[in-house]
Amino acid sequence: MRRTTIAALSLAALTSVAATAPARAEMSLSFYGGPQTAPHSRVKGDDGDGTEFNFLSEWEGKSFEAPPHYGVRGVWWRDENLGFGVDFNHVKVYASDDTREDNGFENLELTDGLNILTANVFYRWPGQFAGGALTPYVSGGLGIAVPHVDVEINDSETFGYQVTGPAVAWIAGVSYDLNDRWAVFGEYKGTFSSNEADLDNGGELKTDIVTNALNVGLTLKF
């Protein structure tokens, strides 16, 4: 249910961008995916029963295991160079087996989506290469993280979506026009999220997570 709600909110945000665009503005809708990783980060908190934890977690992305890493974005291009958009990115992190075993966790995952939703500014340089077909671009965005928290430690078992804190995203890529309507693209995308999750026994878990992804995608322009 919560996953459906997140998807609906993302679609509503994309639709609102389209609704506010003037008739002559260029709109684009993009879908993307690719390998995504996350470096180690510190995990702090308590299980709600008096057990505190503070350790460095090794994260695994498992980008192509269900549910896979993917993203969708809508952009309203005000002119040839400047655009505004909304980006929903289903990134995920699993604590490694060694991390869980060393620190007493049965589960430690943000895996049915770390779910980074951001409002972005885009800047592009149209037709710079390949006879005008290649367009480099950059983007930055601010938003929120809405992960599916799957944490089990001692008698505390947490399983569900939460709004856990602020997020930022940054992108650099290049787009190749197939024709007037369709384009393919490749990009690097990074995210940072500062997460504070509530555990079911009254405890909490805090961690800051960085993700790095190399994406390929398809864009529809209208």
Describe each region flagged by the PLM.
Residues 41-42, 59, 178-222:
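Predominantly the C-terminal beta-signal and adjacent terminal strand-loop region
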Residues 66-70, 112-117, 134, 162-168, ...:
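Residues that define the transmembrane beta-barrel architecture of outer-membrane proteins
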Residues 8-16:
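Bacterial N-terminal signal peptides
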Residues 75-153, 214-221:
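Gram-negative (and chloroplast) outer-membrane scaffold detector with strong preference
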Residues 29-35, 86-90, 138-144, 174, ...:
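Transmembrane beta-barrel strands of outer-membrane/channel proteins
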Residues 57-60, 102-110, 153-161, 200-206:
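Extracellular loop and loop/strand-boundary signature of outer-membrane beta-barrel proteins
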Residues 23-76, 149, 215-221:
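Short glycine/proline- and aromatic-enriched beta-strand/turn motifs that initiate or cap beta-hairpins
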Residues 24-26, 35, 79-81, 131-135, ...:
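Strand-connecting loop/turn motifs
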